[in-house]
A protein has these predicted regions:
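Active-site residues of response regulator receiver
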Residues: 51
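Conserved acidic carboxylate
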Residues: 7
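Acidic catalytic/metal-coordinating carboxylates
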Residues: 32, 58-61
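Alpha2 helix of the CheY-like receiver
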Residues: 34-41, 64
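His-Asp phosphorelay/catalytic-motif detector in bacterial-type signaling
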Residues: 44-46, 70-76
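Short amphipathic alpha-helix used as the core "switch/output" element in two-component signaling
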Residues: 60-71
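Receiver (REC) domain active-site loop signature in two-component systems and cognate sites
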Residues: 54
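Two-component/phosphorelay signaling modules centered on CheY-like receiver
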Residues: 10-28, 42, 68
Length: 77
């Protein structure tokens, strides 16, 4: 399963990536909402984990944008 993780706190992001990879997930990590939106527009993911408060764009705004584009990827905020 391929996931996108958007978390602006690097240490937390690194820890979550390590846990997810240890459990056999493929993970791409980004550190702001704008990058999360760009990744979700450019590629197919099985799920996305979004931080609610991030630089450039918050998780709710990312979710609204991807839903407006018709992307129904499962999202955890």
């Amino acid at each position: 399963m391929r996931l996108l993780l958007a978390e602006d706190e690097r240490e937390l992001s690194d820890a979550l990536v390590a846990i997810l990879k240890h459990n056999n997930y493929s993970v791409d990590a980004v550190y702001n909402g704008e990058d999360a939106l760009n990744y979700l527009e450019a590629d197919n993911y099985d799920g996305a984990i979004l931080d609610i408060m991030m630089p450039k764009m918050d998780g709710i705004t990312v979710l609204k944008n991807i839903r407006a584009q018709g992307n129904d990827v499962p999202v955890l905020i």
